[in-house]
Swiss-Prot record:
This is Phosphate transport system permease protein PstA homolog. It is a multi-pass membrane protein. The gene is pstA. PROSITE patterns: ABC_TM1. InterPro entries: MetI-like (IPR000515), MetI-like_sf (IPR035906), Phosphate_PstA (IPR005672), Phosphate_Transport_Permease (IPR051124). It is found in: Cell membrane. It comes from Mycoplasma genitalium (strain ATCC 33530 / DSM 19775 / NCTC 10195 / G37). Belongs to the binding-protein-dependent transport system permease family. CysTW subfamily. Pfam families: BPD_transp_1. The keyword DNA-binding does not apply. It comes from the Bacteria. The chain crosses the membrane at residues 22-42, 64-84, 113-133, 143-163, 266-286, 303-323, 368-388, 417-437, 453-473, 486-506, 535-555, 613-633.
Length: 654
């Protein structure tokens, strides 16, 4: 008996110690992440270091002024945020308050598809379709900052819609009922009460969306080509220019022919600056999300209000215009004894005022419809663009979808599948064990908050920063490439994307474990069941659905990534297949055609885009419909299916 108890305790301690060790090794990994970035940044050289805070940018002349690239990044991101917030919030109001739950669920699936589309496909769409709109309809330069603002706005719209919709679902619906019972209509309740109620959350959503926009790299390179900042600004053609953002400067010069150690040091510093900016934005978002924090630190509330007022300046002023029209049109404000003769004018103007108010509410609903049409119309447009043109490209004689040579879409698909398989094999067990320790064993709120902050902050980092880490550590230090320190390899790409996916999987596994009712654990402990047995026999089986969905979403994330693979795995595949040799993925194959001189480069982009989008839609279908449907089948139904299957086998034998 004592031996059994000792064995049981040994197993219990083994899981706890092992998962805790992994969790703290995870922290060490990300400390080394920052150390390696800083180490590479110190190689900048004195000439470049002196020029960092100047206005001149010309890496060939050792001028690396950061202000103009940073200014372009900020202006483009703010422009995209203004458009995305206006369309996204109104679309969310339409989905939550105008649509039935079944319709909302189906429309939300379309938004999930938009959020899963790789950024390089957005870039391809902007360079091929949006450019025509700007050139032929607006009579503006086709490839410009205005094009990028439009593209980025639709890239961050899914973030705004999904987060705002989730926020609205938690708002008490009694607020609307109370306002309606006082004589106001539903639209008035939404915009006067609900919108104010979610104002702090909206600020957090806008901050996260801005961080996503400012960190975009690969899609921007499809449109922006110039680094002549001083010349463009002196000629007063900023918005119609094709000046590069800070992130796209990194991806442009990281493998340039004239690149040396000092230029790479400059690019690492640019990456660290983006890292700091995004970290501060995420820190503000996480910190200000807590109402108690806003009460304790009033300056946070002022910053939050400032962000809200800047982004909503135009919509709020349009609404204020209608309020002014409805309030100032009445010359007779109130009927009294001394103006009884003016009662007919009073009622006439009052009626006109009511008409203006109704028109205002009608316009709000109309705006919701237009915004919803724009959001879902863009999804339809990009899907039609990919499916129609991709199908034509696949049916051409030059299609390489079913070829597995070095420069083929089939080989890129195989490389992507290999990367997915190895990455998931590495990261999923590690992420699950770390999530188990954080959720089931750790009792310290401070430790849990530190881990959650690190995970949330690093999860939203620009993926090109991870690419720089992979370049400096896996290729330059460990030399995990057949070409040595200056080469690229599939294994370097796999390990780099594993770092990215590990963060995502830890968080999603944590959420899946949290969704399991704590009453089940308490009941099991009351029966004398050990914590290890509770985890493996109760918690994990109950969280299985969430864990499978997390796994599928992580595969989706791997397929959609470009920057980490572009820097570590290369833009082309080797003639031989080996993990130590270069290998392009589906997304890097699309991006690599930007630098190709082949006449069929666009066709290659289109056929690869079609393969990627079909793959992603299947994954989203599995995670949103198939997996939940399978788990809705109760045990009895599974037994019925099993008995029918056995009867069929018996019948087949006879």
């Amino acid at each position: 008996m004592q031996k059994k108890i000792k064995k049981r305790l040994k197993k219990e301690n083994l899981l706890r110690i092992f998962s805790k060790t992994l969790a703290f090794l995870f922290l060490v990994l990300f400390i080394s992440f920052f150390v390696f970035l800083l180490t590479e940044a110190t190689k900048i050289g004195p000439d470049f270091a002196k020029s960092l805070f100047n206005l001149e940018f010309n890496l060939g002349n050792k001028q690396a002024g950061i202000w103009f690239p940073l200014l372009v990044s900020f202006i483009v991101s703010i422009g995209a945020l203004i458009i995305a917030s206006y369309i996204g919030v109104r679309t969310s109001f339409f989905l939550v308050y105008r649509c039935k739950p079944k319709i909302r669920k189906k429309l939300s699936l379309i938004i999930d598809i938009l959020s899963g589309i790789p950024s390089v496909i957005f870039g391809l769409f902007a360079s091929q379709i949006l450019s025509i709109f700007f050139r032929d309809i607006l009579k503006l330069p086709p490839l410009s900052l205005l094009n990028v603002i439009a593209m980025l706005s639709f890239m961050i719209i899914p973030i705004v819609i999904s987060l705002t919709t989730n926020t609205l679902t938690y708002v008490n619906n009694d607020l609307i009922s109370v306002v309606v019972s006082l004589g106001e209509n539903k639209t008035s309740a939404i915009y006067k009460i609900i919108k104010k109620e979610i104002k702090p959350q909206l600020t957090v959503i806008l901050t996260l969306a801005f961080a996503r926009a400012i960190s975009e790299t690969m899609a921007v390179n499809f449109v922006l080509q110039s680094v002549n900042y001083q010349e463009v600004i002196n000629n007063n053609r900023f918005f119609t220019s094709d000046l590069k953002t800070l992130g796209s400067v990194i991806s442009t010069f990281i493998f340039s022919e004239n690149g040396d150690e000092q230029i790479n040091g400059v690019l690492y510093i640019f990456g660290i600056i983006i890292l700091i900016l995004v970290s501060l934005l995420n820190f503000f978002a996480i910190w200000s999300a807590n109402p108690k924090t806003l009460e304790r630190y009033p300056f946070l509330k002022k910053i939050s209000n400032f962000i809200y007022q800047v982004v909503w300046f135009i919509p709020n002023n349009i609404s204020a215009l209608f309020v002014d029209l409805t309030s100032t049109r009445q010359s007779v404000k109130k009927i009294k004894v001394n103006n009884i003769n003016e009662r007919s004018l009073f009622f006439k103007e009052r009626l006109q005022s009511v008409v203006w108010i109704k028109l205002n509410y009608f316009l709000k609903i109309f705006q919701e419809l237009i915004c919803t049409f724009l959001a879902f119309g863009f999804v339809l447009a990009i899907l039609l663009f990919v499916f129609i043109n991709g199908s034509v490209a696949i049916n051409n004689n030059g299609s390489t979808v079913f070829s597995f040579e070095a420069d083929s879409t089939g080989r890129a698909l195989v490389n992507t599948l290999v990367i997915i398989l190895i990455t998931i094999t590495i990261t999923f067990p590690l992420a699950l064990l770390i999530a188990i320790w954080l959720n089931e064993y750790n009792n310290s709120k401070v430790v849990k908050n530190v881990f959650n902050f690190v995970i949330d902050s690093l999860s939203s980092m620009p993926s090109i920063i991870y690419g720089l880490f992979g370049l400096s550590f896996f290729l330059r230090v460990l030399q995990l490439s057949a070409g040595g320190a200056n080469g690229t390899s599939l294994i370097a790409g796999i390990l780099t994307i594993s770092v990215v996916i590990l963060l995502f999987l830890i968080r999603t596994c944590q959420q899946a474990l949290n969704n399991v009712s704590w009453d089940l654990r308490i009941s099991a402990f009351a029966l004398g069941i050990s914590k290890r047995e509770v985890i493996f026999k109760i918690v994990l089986p109950s969280a299985l659905k969430g864990l499978i969905v997390a796994l599928i979403l992580s595969i989706n994330r791997i397929i959609a990534e470009t920057a980490p693979f572009f820097i570590t795995s290369g833009l082309s595949s080797s003639n031989l297949f080996h993990l130590s040799l270069p290998g392009q993925t589906l997304t890097t194959r699309i991006y690599g055609q930007l630098f190709s001189i082949n006449s069929n480069a666009i066709s290659v982009m289109l056929e690869t885009s079609l393969v990627s989008v079909v793959f992603l839609i299947l994954l989203i279908f599995f995670s949103s419909y198939l997996i939940p449907s399978l788990f809705l089948l109760n045990k009895q139904k599974w037994l019925v299916i099993k008995s029918k299957f056995q009867s069929f086998k018996l019948w087949k034998r006879t």
